[in-house]
Amino acid sequence: MSLVIPEIASIHDVGFAADVQQLLDGKTKPVGSLGLLEQLAHRIACILGTDKPVLEAPQMVVFAGDHGLAAQGVSAYPVDVTWQMVENFMAGGAAVSVLARQHGIALNVVDCGVARDFDVREQDPHDKSPKEGEPRLWRRKVAYGTQDCSQGPAMTEQECAMAMRNGMELVKKLPGNALLLGEMGIGNTSTASLLLAKLCGTSVVEVTGMGTGLDAAGVKRKIAVLQQVLEKHKAVTDPLQVLAAMGGLEVATMVGAVLQAAQERRVIVADGFITTAAVLVASRLRPAVLERCVYAHRSGERGHNLMLLELGAQPLLDWQLRLGEGSGAATAWPLLPAACAILREMASFNSAGVATKCD
């Protein structure tokens, strides 16, 4: 696959990490009393390389694409929902639209491989910026959906490489230092289950859930289809070939975006099951990606907890969210600037003239 993957060096700096921890411990509070908020502040400081972190121009990117595997009945919804939801994102009516607007997060929607063309938006003939607060549509279609991976590869290696390259180039154009991941694609929980099972050697039974709302019989049928896919591609082991064989165009584009964001030392906020699957693939290509990631929540989708454990990840929320779109990332977002403010603005015992703990 002719693709140049950016080099991503480790940002682990023992001395700097210790200095940040000392700053946090010296704030006017018992040591560790702000719990995970302190850990979040520490992580963001280490990602950005400063003990006075500021999150600037956060970008929510919703990657959209259709899946040939959906023809096998692995979703409770028809494939038309993918393009209909893209229109909903652009109209401002989806959950992620509302939450991004509420928290001042720029919303970008990327057509990576939706099985329908979209009208040219006034703001998008040449990737011009939309009016402030309006969503932005990026047309980066590689194909009109993937092929049915129960019959053959979902993508050619060239299509997969093109999608990843699109993701890298897109991030280069985005302002700010924080990338929030979202997705839309009927059938993409199946893709996430397949990637987890294949890359981590986990039983597909353990990582396959209801997705958009399948009943028990539907989940059983979905598992049977996914087992067929894994059998079809059992000889494939290389992460890029696995992604091409059973991934999605939106997932491949997201993998590229994650790699580029990590190379630029942006804070990467993963949403739920599908976006974490993209992080998993990216980490198999460049392990230091994980040092730049924050995980918004533990999804109610079966398999996500196993994926988080595989990545050694501590999610911020555990609210049984399983909508996707980036809705969980947008919900958790206010915790990140709050954590940064604690590190930047909270007084120390010395500066406030407050007595420390008795010996």
Across the structure, where does each feature detected by a protein language model lie?
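N-terminal loops that bind phosphate or other acidic moieties
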Residues: 1-359
